[in-house]
Structure formats: structure tokens, C-alpha cells
């Protein structure tokens, strides 16, 4: 089994050096740990490194059908990969596609209606959910400032505060890099 087999790119493209390195790390984890049965059928589509505030984070893209399987082992996988890549934060995001908005006046009878899961809003919301996993988004407030800019306040599950609080800056930076939207994360008290 070659290292690249853990990285299967769309259009049969060749993985770059960084993606091969990530694929090799996942393959080593599969060979050495008790995660072998869960990791056997899993692969990634691409990986990239983003820099923010003199820190680095690794974004690993996984195919949407394999996302549930990845999430079952994600906490252990993230812990092991962060050890391997000297403390860089690792996030898993499903590889989703945004279809363009249908234009008025242009008639294309063969074209299918655009599914909700391919809209910009749905994809951006799903990216947010993927980023903060295993925590859950329990609420969201969008504050529109007078100059028209938006600030999204995301309320996360208070029970997960201890596990992900140290990564909140990473989540905000990665989300800004991927979507261009400012976001802040909060852990509000549970109101009954």
C-alpha cells in the first residue's frame, strides 16, 4: 500500500508533498494503533495548512459520504495528528461544493433544481458544524453593524467548553480564511 492511497483527489490528480505527508501520517496511525478497522476504508481528498497569528493549523478535507465514519474516530485521530505535527491544530472538514445561484431569464430545461445542501448558506453552516466537532452549535446570532459588516456570534455547547476552548481562535481564523466571514465563539449558560 502506498502513502498516496490515503489521499484520493478529485479528477485523479496527484497529491502534493504536504498532502502525501498527511496521508502517510494517517497510514502510520492505521498500521500501529487499534484504529485499524475504522481507518481502513477512510481516505482524504486534500489537505492544506493555514497560518494565523504566528500559529499554523492543518485543514484536512474528507469526502461527505465518509464524514460520519471520520467523526467516530475524529477525537483520537486529531489528538494523534496534533502530536505528530508538533502541536499544530488539526481540523476535519467535509469537501462540499457550492452551486451558483440560478440566473433569472436564463432557461435551461435540462438542468436540475439546485439542492439546498449545495447553496452557499448551507455549505457555510455545514463548515461551521464540521469545524467545532465534537461540540455542537446550540445557537447563532448575526450582528449587522452600521457599516453593513456582519459579525456572527456562535453559541457552543457548554458541556464541551473544556475540550475545545483552547481551539476557539483557530476555529475563528480557519472559518474566516475559508468563508471570509468574521465569527466569534461563546459558551453561554444553559437557560431553561
Curated annotation (Swiss-Prot):
Q: Does the keyword Coiled coil apply?
A: no
Annotated GO biological process: ribosomal small subunit biogenesis; rRNA processing; translation
PROSITE patterns (alphabetical):
RIBOSOMAL_S7E
Instruction: Establish whether keyword Ribosomal protein is in the entry.
Output: yes
The record's annotation in InterPro entries points to:
Ribosomal_eS7 (IPR000554), Ribosomal_eS7_CS (IPR047861)
Source domain of life is Eukaryota
A UniProt-annotated Pfam family:
Ribosomal_S7e
Q: Name the GO cellular-component terms.
A: cytosolic small ribosomal subunit; small-subunit processome
What protein family does this chain belong to? Belongs to the eukaryotic ribosomal protein eS7 family.
PANTHER family associated with the record: 40S RIBOSOMAL PROTEIN S7, SMALL RIBOSOMAL SUBUNIT PROTEIN ES7
The protein's name is: Small ribosomal subunit protein eS7
**What's the gene?**
RpS7
Amino acid at each position: 500500500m502506498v502513502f498516496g492511497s490515503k489521499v484520493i483527489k478529485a479528477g485523479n490528480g496527484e497529491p502534493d508533498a504536504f498532502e502525501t505527508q498527511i496521508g502517510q501520517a494517517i497510514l502510520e496511525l492505521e498500521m500501529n494503533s487499534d484504529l485499524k478497522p475504522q481507518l481502513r476504508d477512510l481516505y482524504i481528498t486534500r489537505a492544506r495548512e493555514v497560518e494565523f497569528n504566528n500559529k499554523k493549523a492543518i485543514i484536512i478535507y474528507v469526502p461527505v459520504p465518509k464524514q460520519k465514519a471520520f467523526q467516530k474516530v475524529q477525537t483520537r485521530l486529531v489528538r494523534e495528528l496534533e502530536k505528530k505535527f508538533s502541536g499544530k491544530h488539526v481540523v476535519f472538514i467535509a469537501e462540499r461544493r457550492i452551486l451558483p445561484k440560478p440566473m433569472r431569464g436564463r432557461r435551461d430545461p435540462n438542468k436540475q433544481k439546485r439542492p439546498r445542501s449545495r447553496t452557499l448558506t448551507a455549505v457555510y453552516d455545514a463548515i461551521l458544524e464540521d469545524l467545532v466537532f465534537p461540540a455542537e452549535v446550540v445557537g447563532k446570532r448575526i450582528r449587522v453593524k452600521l457599516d453593513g459588516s456582519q459579525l456572527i456570534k456562535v453559541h457552543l455547547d457548554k458541556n464541551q467548553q473544556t475540550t475545545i476552548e483552547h481551539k476557539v481562535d483557530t476555529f475563528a481564523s480557519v472559518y474566516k480564511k475559508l468563508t471570509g466571514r468574521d465569527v466569534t465563539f461563546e459558551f453561554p449558560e444553559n437557560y431553561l
